[in-house]
Amino acid sequence: MIRKIVITIGLVLTIGLAATAQRVALKNNLAYDAILTPNLSLEFAMGNKFTFDTQVGWNAFIFNLDAGKPNYSETKWAHWMAQPELRYWFCDVFNGWFLGLHGHVGQMNVGGIDIPFVLENKNSIMKDHRYEGWFYGGGLSVGYQWVLSTRSSLEFSLGAGYARILYDKFPCQRCGTKIDEGKANYVGPTKATISYVFFFK
């Protein structure tokens, strides 16, 4: 499954790069950095009005609570996600307002944390368990990019949409045998960017 996703993304990137001789941008989403998730994105111009963005992020960290306490547990927010987006620019590419159509796919291993509006986040149930699974979906976004120089810009965007989540449930944040499995439908915010943009050409 992962191999197929990587191959598909690679083909899309190759097509996008071949489709333009204008600009290629390398980006880092500072909003994603704020939740301690390293990320990068390549965005390719496809003519005068369209670009194709390819954000990916990966978090493999475990945030330990006080190991000396009897109720010691682990808080983890491990996941990876790919979120490609086709953008339409009202002015020129990489300048001003844009609308985006994005998809997303990823994998998670989350424990000891509440995620609003997702899964079983009722009466603090979710933070007492661990969840492993996959998610996929898509949405729409709107954003704006300020040109800082010939080589850099600053981008802001917000998006909302849908995600289908398939998960296994475990009894504690750290260990245990699977006790349940489920599916969830999420509708709400799916994208937020505060990105520094660097142009290769």
Descriptions of predicted regions:
Residues 89, 186-201:
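Outer-membrane beta-barrel "beta-signal"
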Residues 5, 22-26, 48-52, 93-99, ...:
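Outer-envelope beta-barrel architecture signal
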Residues 30-34, 56-62, 88, 103-109, ...:
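Transmembrane beta-strands of outer-membrane beta-barrel pores
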Residues 25-41, 59, 93:
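Solvent-exposed loop/turn segments connecting transmembrane beta-strands
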Residues 24, 36-40, 80-84, 136-140, ...:
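Hydrophobic, lipid-facing positions within transmembrane beta-strands of outer-membrane proteins
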Residues 29, 56-81, 108-135, 163-191:
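Extracellular/periplasm-exposed beta-strand and loop segments of Gram-negative cell-envelope proteins
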Residues 26-30, 42, 54-56, 84-86, ...:
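Membrane-embedded beta-strand positions of outer-membrane beta-barrel proteins
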Residues 1-24, 196, 200:
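Bacterial Sec-dependent N-terminal signal peptides
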